[in-house]
Amino acid sequence: MEFIISFLPAFGIVALFFVFWKNSWVSKQPVGDEKMSNIAKNIAEGAMSFLKAEYKILSVFVVAVAVLLVFKGNSEEGSNSMVAVSFVVGAICSALAGFIGMKVATKANVRTTNAARSSLAKALEVAFAGGSVMGLGVVGLGVLGLSSLFMIYSSMEWGTNIEMVLNVLSGFSLGASSIALFARVGGGIYTKAADV
C-alpha cells in the first residue's frame, strides 16, 4: 500500500506533462484571419482580466477561512490546525486549474472555429485537445496535491492516526470546492454581462 502511495505524486506530474504537451499542440494550430485573431485576443484579455479580479477577491476569502480553520483546529479537541494548510493548498490547486482552463479555452475556441472551415474532424480534434487540457489539469493537480499532503501528514508525529490524517486532508476538498464554486458563479455572471 505504501509503495503505491509513494508513486501517486508521479502520476499527477505525468498528467501535468500531458497538459503542457496538449496545450502547446493547441497553441501551434492556425488562428485564422486577422478578424478572428482580433476577436480572440479581445476575448482572452477580457477573460484574464476577469480572472485576475476574481482571484484577488478570492484570496481574501481564502486567508479569512484559513485563519478560522487554524482557530478551530487549536480550540477543539480532536481537531488539527493543519486542516488550514490543506484548505489553502486545495484552493491554490483549484485556482491554478481554473487559470490553465481559461488560458487553453480562449486559445482553443478560435482555433476550433478556424479548423471547422476545413473539416469537422479537425475541429473536433482541436476542441477535444483543448478540453483534455482542462480535464487532465484538474486531475493532475488534484492527485499531486492530495497525495503530496497525505505523504507529508503521514510522516508527522500524529500521522499514524489515519482518521486524523483523513480529517486534515478534508480541508483540501473544501478549498478546491470553494474556489470552483465561486469561479462557476462568478464566471456565469461575467459571461451573462458580456452577452448583454
Q: Which ranges hold each PLM region?
A:
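Hydrophobic, small-residue-rich transmembrane alpha-helices and their short perimembrane loops
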Residues: M1-V196
